[in-house]
Design a protein with these regions (language model features):
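Active-site mouth loops of central-metabolism enzymes
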Residues: 11-32, 112-124
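Active-site glycine-rich loop that binds ribose-phosphate moieties when present
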Residues: 23-45, 61
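Short, small-residue-biased leader/transition segments that mark boundaries at the very start
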Residues: 1-7
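Catalytic-face loop-and-helix region of soluble metabolic enzyme cores
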Residues: 76-140
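Short helix-capping segments at alpha-helix termini
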Residues: 44-46, 70-75, 137-140
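Active-site beta-loop-alpha junctions enriched in small/polar residues
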Residues: 13-19, 54-58, 81-87, 147-152
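Active-site-adjacent beta->alpha loops and helix N-cap segments on the catalytic face
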Residues: 4, 55-70, 152-156
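Conserved, mostly hydrophobic/aromatic
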Residues: 38, 47, 80, 145
Length: 163
């Protein structure tokens, strides 16, 4: 007897800061078109979907992107990607490898402050800013946080316990 497999939940990629690999010209045309197609797919099927984004460090970019996709009719819930606690060098390396644009500038600014170079990065600021925005805008489409354990699972787990 053959068993039928069923995928109930689908998570798709979101790119609040674009993707140079998908849109080498620096626009978000291909990323936007793909997200629109996936949104239409979710409407015409029984697909339960969520958008899980690349990791981000800048709440303004996230808020602008999330509001923009919502205004364009994309109603798939968003799980925002956040880099967990890690050394600055680790975050810069992953940011460059993954092409998280605007966020690299935030990390570079932090790298110039010698006192912050010695301390591990913690995503407290972006989490606080997004939580405050969600609190005053309940229809904001970010529903969950997805932590990328770039500094290790133990560090992320400890951070989550602290917040």
């Amino acid at each position: 007897r053959q068993r039928q497999m069923c995928i109930r939940d689908r998570h798709i990629a979101g790119h609040p800061e674009g993707s140079k690999e998908i849109d080498p010209d620096g626009t978000t045309a291909n990323v936007d078109q793909a997200l629109s197609w996936k949104n239409e797919f979710s409407k015409r099927t029984d697909a339960s979907m969520a958008i899980t984004t690349q990791f981000c460090f800048d709440s303004n970019s996230v808020i602008e992107w999330a509001n923009g996709i919502q205004k364009s009719g994309i109603d798939i819930p968003v799980h925002i990607g956040i880099a967990g606690p890690a050394k600055l060098q680790t975050l810069l390396r992953y940011s460059i490898e993954c092409g998280v644009g605007a966020s690299i500038k935030i990390l570079q600014k932090r790298a110039k402050d010698i006192t912050k170079l010695l301390l591990p990065y913690k995503p407290t600021q972006i989490i606080s800013e997004l939580a405050a925005y969600k609190s005053s805008n309940p229809d904001f489409n970010i529903e969950k946080v997805h932590f990328f354990p770039l500094g290790g699972i133990k560090q992320v787990s400890q951070f989550v316990k602290e917040i």
